[in-house]
Regions:
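Boundary at the C-terminal end of the N-terminal hydrophobic targeting segment
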Residues: 14-16
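Short, basic/aromatic recognition patches
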Residues: 18-26
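Active-site helix/loop module of the DD-peptidase/beta-lactamase fold
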Residues: 69, 79-82, 97-137, 168-206
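Active-site SXXK
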Residues: 42, 61-70, 76-103, 161-166
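Active-site-proximal alpha-helical segments within enzyme catalytic domains
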Residues: 157-164, 204-206
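A short, well-structured edge-of-sheet supersecondary motif
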Residues: 27-71
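N-terminal signal peptide c-region/cleavage motif recognized by signal peptidases
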Residues: 9-11
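Solvent-exposed loop and edge beta-strand segments that line ligand/cofactor-binding
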Residues: 144-153, 200-206
Length: 206
């Protein structure tokens, strides 16, 4: 089942056979593909948006409400889920390049107290630890291991990087992302939006 937007880089020629194109689109719709794009050397050869139907497996139903946010100018609006972590890590890299932060310094030095640990233990957790999922914290921000000693996929802890970015830049995440990244990449329809109850551990989606 495809729920996210997939971009295919291909050397295939433009689909000139309408029957073949219709057959392809029907297959994509049946498999709950929301967006399909074929690109070659930076040129978009074929692009189409589809409405995802609720014919999903039980374990996928939760993602329907997470990923479907309707349409904007006939284009599907979706939460890109954990792809946003790639955006955040790039923005952290840009912030360091600008001299606004150092990934080897503690998270606390930028956003203040943020865990349930003692101040001494919390000070050991660096931005690098958050980037590499080695904070040593569990999903409730409690101690689980020494920072850097154990890998644990933890979206709630990783999301603190958004606050680090906002604190160090003096900008809200949408403004910051647009200025530093989205505008440069001509991603004119990409933005951050509040999630309901911090779904998936991130307070916002992209």
């Amino acid at each position: 089942i495809f729920l996210l937007t997939f971009i295919f880089i291909s050397s295939l020629p433009v689909f000139s056979d309408n029957s073949a194109k219709s057959e392809l689109f029907e297959y994509l719709i049946q498999n709950n593909t929301s967006s399909f794009l074929v690109s070659e050397k930076g040129e978009i050869l074929l692009e189409e948006e589809f409405e995802v139907q609720k014919k999903l497996k039980p374990q996928s139903l939760m993602f329907f409400n997470l990923l479907r946010h309707g349409f904007i100018e006939n284009r599907s609006q979706e939460d890109v889920a954990s792809i946003q972590k790639s955006f955040v890590s790039i923005l952290i890299g840009i912030a360091q390049q600008k001299g606004l932060l150092d990934i080897n310094k503690s998270v606390t030095s930028y956003i203040g107290k943020w865990t349930l640990l003692t101040q001494e233990k919390e000070n050991l957790i660096t931005i690098r630890n958050l980037l590499t999922m080695t904070s040593g914290l569990d999903a409730d921000f409690k101690y689980d291991a020494q920072p850097g000693s154990k890998w644990l996929y933890n979206s709630r802890v990783y999301s603190q990087l958004i606050y680090v970015l906002e604190k160090t830049s003096g900008l809200q995440i949408n403004e910051l992302s647009s200025q530093w990244l989205f505008n440069e990449l001509e991603m004119k329809e990409t933005f951050w939006k509040e999630r309901k109850k911090g779904f998936g551990g991130f307070p916002k989606d992209s």
